[in-house]
């Protein structure tokens, strides 16, 4: 696994995994490369991309472009999550919960990169089941998408934020 951080404007780009795959044909093997990347603006927007190409730089470039196109907003609460949240994708399940300030990101591999790109500075996260980086990133993005801010819940229920927070 390679970890590369670049700054494109205000976006943080993180390379999570590069994989060599081969296709066997009559004349031998054809090698190509896949790249998994996460992009975030450090202000609650995050996206991931998966690119394939015959060369590593081209695969990374394609993955970064897809990640920039697939960005979504995440409602954070002063550098941590709003509430404990679960996410799943195929065999990977992710549980993420808020942590007090100064805790840092307690997460493994692909989850740490996705949480850091979304600017969640303090969160505890655990992955269950498959630890395939692609599925873990998709499950993490699913969990972040399922997270609701008190304002969103109050608007949905037609109550005030004070009523929701108790």
From Swiss-Prot:
GO molecular function annotations of the record = rRNA binding; structural constituent of ribosome
Domain S5 DRBM stretches: 11-74
Q: Which GO terms describe its cellular component?
A: small ribosomal subunit
Q: Which keywords does this chain's UniProt record carry? A: Ribonucleoprotein, Ribosomal protein, RNA-binding, rRNA-binding
Which cysteines does the record link by disulfide bonds? none
Q: Which InterPro entries match?
A: Ribosomal_Su5_D2-typ_SF (IPR020568), Ribosomal_uS5 (IPR000851), Ribosomal_uS5_bac-type (IPR005712), Ribosomal_uS5_C (IPR005324), Ribosomal_uS5_N (IPR013810), Ribosomal_uS5_N_CS (IPR018192), Ribsml_uS5_D2-typ_fold_subgr (IPR014721)
User: Which top-level group of life is the source organism from?
Assistant: Bacteria
Biological processes, Gene Ontology terms:
translation
List the HAMAP family.
Ribosomal_uS5_B
Of which family is this protein a member?
Answer: Belongs to the universal ribosomal protein uS5 family.
PANTHER family, per this entry?
MITOCHONDRIAL RIBOSOMAL PROTEIN S5
- Biological function: With S4 and S12 plays an important role in translational accuracy.
Any further remark recorded for this protein: Fifteen X have been added to this sequence so that it corresponds better to orthologs from other subspecies of Buchnera aphidicola.
Assembly = Part of the 30S ribosomal subunit. Contacts proteins S4 and S8.
Q: Which comment does the entry carry about domains?
A: The N-terminal domain interacts with the head of the 30S subunit; the C-terminal domain interacts with the body and contacts protein S4. The interaction surface between S4 and S5 is involved in control of translational fidelity.
The protein here is known as Small ribosomal subunit protein uS5
Q: Which organism is it from?
A: Buchnera aphidicola subsp. Acyrthosiphon kondoi
Protein's gene = rpsE
């Amino acid at each position: 696994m390679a970890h590369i951080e670049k700054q494109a404007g205000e976006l943080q780009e993180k390379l999570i995994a590069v994989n060599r795959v081969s296709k066997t044909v009559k004349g031998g093997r054809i090698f190509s490369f896949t790249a998994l990347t996460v992009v975030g603006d450090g202000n609650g927007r995050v996206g991931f991309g998966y690119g394939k190409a015959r060369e590593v730089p081209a695969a990374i470039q394609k993955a970064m472009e897809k990640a920039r196109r697939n960005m979504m907003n995440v409602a954070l609460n002063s550098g941590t999550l709003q509430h404990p949240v679960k996410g799943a994708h195929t065999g990977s399940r992710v549980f993420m919960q808020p942590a007090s300030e100064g805790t840092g990101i307690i997460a493994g591999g692909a989850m740490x990169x996705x949480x850091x790109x979304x600017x969640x500075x303090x969160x505890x996260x655990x992955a269950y089941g498959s630890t395939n980086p692609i599925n873990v990133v998709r499950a993490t993005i699913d969990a972040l998408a399922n997270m609701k801010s008190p304002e969103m819940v109050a608007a949905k229920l037609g109550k005030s934020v004070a009523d929701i927070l108790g």
